Structure formats: C-alpha cells, structure tokens
C-alpha cells in the first residue's frame, strides 16, 4: 500500500492511496509479473528475496510500462541478472526508452497466443493494446485459470493488507466511488 500520494501521476486524486500489484510464481521456473513503483522499492525487493528464498529468478514478465508497474525493473535486473525479460516488441522498445540503451537484459519477445511453460504452469500471452497504453499485454495461466491483467481491472485505493476479493467490502470500499 502506498498512502504517500495525494495525486496519482499528478492528475488523479487518490485520497485512499494506491496499491501496486506484482506477482511471483514459484514453479520449476520462477516468474515475476511486473514490478512496482520506486516509492515502495525497498519492501518490494525484500519481499521478492524472501519469497524466492535463495532460488534464482528465471523470468520477469513485463506486461505494462507505466511506472507503477515497471519502475523497479532495472533494480530487479541488477539483483537478478540471470532473469529473462519476457515482453512484446512494443514493450522492449519502451524499456530502453525508459531505462536507457545501455540497460543489460536478456529479452524474449512474445506475441499473441505464445506460451511459456514454467513446469506445472503454462502461461499464454494476449495483447491488450490501449487498455490505456499501447504496449499492454496480459498473461493467462492456463493451468490454474488465472488472468494476470496488468491494468485492465485496476482501481485506486490501498488494500489495507487484503490480497483477495473476498477480503474487502465491495459496497463500503468501492461502490462509494461509483
């Protein structure tokens, strides 16, 4: 949770803060889905290291380049230079625009319907341009039927420790904004 912001990107009022959603899949291969904003980088890096528990990070899937999803990508790659960055062609160009042409990374470009097998899990990539940026893609875990949706279904507001939909009161927490 990030409650330090009054305005998100200097445009949107966020009186209830924001949350940054990055996910780590532990399988035969480890996969990080997006990163987070620099404001919470210290705890993010600590959480990733703790969850990996000494394992290497195999993949970083970059679904969206907005800074609240990607600002700590360079820091992750410095800590895990072995990680392969999975992204689409538009995202690759944007990564170098954001972080500079000298950023060291191993890249695997994916397109619509491509599949990455991580062990038990099979991840398929679906392009979702203009969810609100042109490079957005989402990742679907075929095995567990989970959609990692980038910004497609996002909302503002800190989660107050909640991780799952059934841990929040929809009417009290979200309907008031509608």
Task: Enumerate the predicted regions with their spans.
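Active-site environment of divalent metal-dependent phosphoester hydrolases
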Residues: 3-4, 65-70, 93-94, 132-133, ...
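Metallo-beta-lactamase
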Residues: 87-178
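Divalent metal-coordination and catalytic microenvironments
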Residues: 25, 34, 64-66, 139, ...
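Zn-dependent metallo-beta-lactamase
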Residues: 1-29
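Residue-level marker for buried hydrophobic side chains located in beta-strands
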Residues: 31, 61, 146-149
